[in-house]
């Protein structure tokens, strides 16, 4: 009988619990890094205390706090040329923009988590309305879209439909409270689900 350490078994269990891809593994190195180092990351950043203060001051929920943390991790981990918050009921995210802009590095080759290919200079969007989503998909990629759907199921359906129609191409991650889309011609359509 082969020996497996308890750490290896725990990692395998976490992998099976966190990432579901219709019974298949994550084959894209970019998607694997996105899932493990950004979406599922548990490390605390020094900016999280400031983010928590802003979210609580606006009386937002725990789901909004998790999305704000994820939005910050996305800004910190990828080369970002611009950040926009689009839609109503996102005043807390508007207040976080200066903090997010301090975290970005717009140079793919010099990025602390890189280097990234030159074509991976993303626009980062937080979208809360269908009209804003329709407007953004007309812009040229690459873009990272974080779309909170826990209060607006029709926005989730619209995002999935745009991905199936090919209007949004790239990686789509179904989160419990949001849709995360990495729209880039570099990636073929990939769909994942994170349960954490």
Which residues make up each language-model segment?
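Short beta-strand/loop segment that forms part of the nucleotide-sugar
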Residues: 145-148
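A short alpha-helical cap/connector motif
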Residues: 1-124, 130-141, 151-196
